[in-house]
């Protein structure tokens, strides 16, 4: 009953939106169009994942792969609230900031972008597990969760970072 119910919207949405806009406009002002596009690609990947998450629920009639539990200012989709969408809008920008300038630099024979994608994906999985342990994120499928973190890693986050770095 809270899905897209605007009666729950709080004032903190306004400063959060301004932070996201500030980050993007600062990058544009610095001429970092590639970073802005990478951030939007990362954010777009989240929307893609949220759509297939909803389709899993729709066609299975059982449960989404992940769902939001607890308080939120605005629940946009079953697995996406306004706080998370703002976070993902900034995460793609942040994920490009520590990259080496040399796109072809390799570590142990593997392109550095794949290393960064793997490390950030693993960190993101750890954050998801903490959110799940805190009861803020619900998982109901055996192939997605603490006992199967590879689903979250390979389907949930690695594509986000890979697309972000490909665009960048």
PLM regions: where:
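Aromatic-rich, lipid-facing transmembrane alpha helices and their immediate juxtamembrane interface loops
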Residues: 1-168
């Amino acid at each position: 009953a809270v899905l897209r119910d605007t009666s729950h919207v709080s004032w903190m949405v306004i400063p959060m939106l301004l932070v996201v806009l500030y980050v993007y406009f600062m990058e544009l002002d610095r001429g970092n169009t590639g970073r802005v596009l990478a951030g939007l690609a990362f954010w777009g990947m989240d929307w893609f994942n949220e759509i297939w998450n909803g389709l899993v629920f729709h066609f299975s009639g059982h449960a989404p792969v992940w769902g939001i539990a607890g308080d939120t200012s605005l629940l946009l989709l079953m697995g996406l609230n306004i706080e998370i969408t703002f976070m993902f809008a900034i995460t793609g920008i942040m994920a490009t900031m520590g990259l080496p300038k040399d796109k072809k630099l390799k570590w142990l024979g593997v392109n550095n972008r794949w290393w960064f994608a793997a490390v950030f994906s693993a960190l993101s999985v750890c954050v998801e597990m903490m959110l799940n342990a805190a009861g803020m994120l619900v998982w109901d499928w055996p192939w997605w969760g603490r006992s199967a973190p590879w689903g979250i890693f390979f389907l949930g986050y690695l594509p986000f970072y890979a697309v972000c770095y490909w665009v960048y």
